[in-house]
């Protein structure tokens, strides 16, 4: 028995019956020899961490565009916070931590520059729309590794695809067919919003857009006064509610779920859609729109002559992969006059 097989046996011996087991993965698009050290989900986690798309997240916006302060979140710090919360829940429920971590680390790989402002801009430009979760799957299936993708397992790709909620989407999917294939995937989905509503409040306070006591009193009473209190309350509630339903689904109690939905609505109304934030979003959208128009009009400058993909698809992949800094620098090079002396 090699090390991988020992680790797989430990999973069967220690994890809950509903936990995803590495040895029972639905597999990959392309068959590969098994590794003698690492189970399948660990290999997926490692591939994501070593990918170029993962490294670029450190220069992509979470909420505030190119913030000058050192302590504002980026897309990378968001991903790490989501993953930490998700692993805490998975460990407490005896679910597969490594699968949870792989999905958490990979869930935003396809996010565009300038956060949701960039996503909204690209959504208007491409036929069929643009969603960061579908682009994240495209990154791991096609774009990484010089067009070969990362060849991740079905469970990781499914968790990445089904993590997103948007402004009004269900926090917990009610219909079984709409849920992730694994409980671990649904853990990342709920951990995503637990992370972002709380760290975005922290960034909003730092930016002077919010005060801690601005959050409605009933929400603070239900969830907690500080970010750490709210995260602790929600994490414990997910664990307790999931245990109470005997792992039928990843759950929250009705009162905490309602308070979280109200907090999300509050954040959209009082931060994400405020004139200050929207004004910067509109600038970012203009940058990406002009870049898209230029790139599609001059594809030979960026993609060469030989490429089977449609120009619009190439342009979207190119622009979605940009960091904020790269997009701004390219915009300045293409559209801002430079002094000759």
Summary of predicted features, one role per range:
Residues 99, 103, 108-149:
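A generic, well-ordered mixed alpha/beta core segment in the N-terminal half of proteins
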Residues 1-79, 83-89, 96-97, 130-341:
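Histidine-centered, transition-metal-coordinating active-site segments
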